[in-house]
């Protein structure tokens, strides 16, 4: 074989070798691109899953908080029906005490029983609303009638007909009240 044919053969072999290398490089680039694309897809999916997980955890915390509030409210206000019955009994005891005279042993016994019931109600978050002298508040009071009284600001509670009650700062029964108003002839002076 001549040198020129050896040279041609060598050039041809180099060219084939380069093409194989280029093809291999091209395949490697394609595989790398495919792997990068797969990696990016997986990263996006991981971000989506993390977001879903965060939302699920937040939803779970919200549900837990709501349930705890409902349980707390249920225990706080479970005594509401009993409390309403008890305050009716307190009203009856008050009426009896108003009829009986101070110093009467029955009056004193009823007074002690009444005070015991009121103290027990307080232990459970039930408080009396005695708004005498305060301004009328429709959230806590029920106006029954207005009475002329030029000495007090209009809308001031001048008499409490029935004591109101709250349970843990929530109205159980409004106080029934009489309000002051200016007399009709007061405005003509």
From Swiss-Prot:
Homodimer. It comes from Wolbachia sp. subsp. Drosophila simulans (strain wRi). This is Protein GrpE. The gene is grpE. InterPro entries: GrpE, GrpE_coiled_coil, GrpE_head. It is found in: Cytoplasm. The keyword DNA repair does not apply. SUPFAM superfamilies: Coiled-coil domain of nucleotide exchange factor GrpE, Head domain of nucleotide exchange factor GrpE. Residues 17-33 have a biased composition (Basic and acidic residues). Pfam families: GrpE. One of its GO terms (biological process) is protein folding. Participates actively in the response to hyperosmotic and heat shock by preventing the aggregation of stress-denatured proteins, in association with DnaK and GrpE. It is the nucleotide exchange factor for DnaK and may function as a thermosensor. Unfolded proteins bind initially to DnaJ; upon interaction with the DnaJ-bound protein, DnaK hydrolyzes its bound ATP, resulting in the formation of a stable complex. GrpE releases ADP from DnaK; ATP binding to DnaK triggers the release of the substrate protein, thus completing the reaction cycle. GO terms for molecular function: adenyl-nucleotide exchange factor activity; protein homodimerization activity; protein-folding chaperone binding; unfolded protein binding. It comes from the Bacteria. CDD domains: GrpE (cd00446).
């Amino acid at each position: 074989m001549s040198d020129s044919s050896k040279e041609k053969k060598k050039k041809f072999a180099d060219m084939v070798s380069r093409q194989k290398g280029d093809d291999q490089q091209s395949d490697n680039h394609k595989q790398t691109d495919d792997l990068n694309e797969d990696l990016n897809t997986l990263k996006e999916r991981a971000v989506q899953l993390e977001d879903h997980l965060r939302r699920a955890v937040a939803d779970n915390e919200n549900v837990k908080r709501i349930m705890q509030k409902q349980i707390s409210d249920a225990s706080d206000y479970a005594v509401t029906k009993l409390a309403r019955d008890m305050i009716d009994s307190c009203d009856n005891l008050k009426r009896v005490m108003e009829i009986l005279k101070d110093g009467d042993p029955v009056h004193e016994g009823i007074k002690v029983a009444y005070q015991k019931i009121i103290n027990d109600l307080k232990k459970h978050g039930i408080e009396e609303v005695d708004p005498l002298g305060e301004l009328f508040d429709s959230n806590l009071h029920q106006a029954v009638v207005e009475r002329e009284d030029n000495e007090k600001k209009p809308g001031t509670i001048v008499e409490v007909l029935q004591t109101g009650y709250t349970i843990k700062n929530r109205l159980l029964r409004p106080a029934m009240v009489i309000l002051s108003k200016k007399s009709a002839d007061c405005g003509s002076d």
